[in-house]
Every structure is written in C-alpha cells, then in structure tokens.
Regions:
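Thiol/selenol-based redox catalytic cores and closely related redox-interacting motifs
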Residues: 38-115
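Thiol-based oxidoreductase modules, predominantly thioredoxin-like and allied folds used
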Residues: 27-38
C-alpha cells in the first residue's frame, strides 16, 4: 500500500509523522511534493494529489476520507478509528468535514503547484 501525502504541508506532515512511528512494513510513504512519479502511479494531477490524501492499494486509488479509513484499518493502534468512522452516518459526516478541512489546506498550500 502506498500513501501519497504532502510533506510540505506542516499539518499534513505532523499527522503522517505520527502514523509513520507505527513502522507498518506494508505501508510505503510517498511525498507528493514535485513528484512526477506519484502523478503517474495514481493517474492524478499535482492539483488532485495536493487536494486530498491518496492511497494506492492493489492497483486501486482511494482518496480523502475513504483513504483515511483504509490507512486506519491497516494500523492496529488506529483500528478503533476505522471501526468508528466506517459507520455510514459517521462516515458521511466525516467525509463532509474532511472535504472542508482539505479545501482550506489546499488553498493554503496551492502555491506548491507547478502551474
């Protein structure tokens, strides 16, 4: 499983650094900052990658709240988050809140785009 994240975003980096401490061997952490290969692997533009967290697992790309669910499911310490946020009503609310938060992070970080 590959997790595509923005290492240049302080908030994103802080959260991912917490997850990296779990040292899950099956997770490959990929910084999307100026990373053409990340764009090719995910078939996403730099803008799309900057906008949301992405995960590629078994050749399928997940993004946003769905990507977080997959990440938490693979991390024993955070599986309780998966079990809670996968509930349909909770997931719908989480997705909306995630999109709002991700939008503001995107606005803050879009200067990183190549144009």
């Amino acid at each position: 499983m590959k997790v595509y994240f923005n290492n240049s975003c302080k908030i994103c980096k802080a959260e991912i650094d917490i997850y990296k401490k779990q040292k899950i061997q099956e997770i490959d952490w990929v910084d999307i900052t100026n990373n053409i290969s990340a764009e090719k692997e995910t078939l996403k533009s730099d803008k799309e990658l900057l906008r949301r967290l992405h995960i590629k697992d078994n050749e399928k790309v997940f993004e946003g709240a769905e990507a977080f669910l997959l990440l938490w499911k693979r991390m024993p310490k955070y599986r309780f988050l998966y079990n809670f946020f996968k509930l349909p009503i909770v997931f719908n609310i989480f997705s909306i809140i995630y999109e709002i938060f991700a939008f503001f992070l995107y606005i803050k970080n879009k200067k990183q785009l190549k144009n």
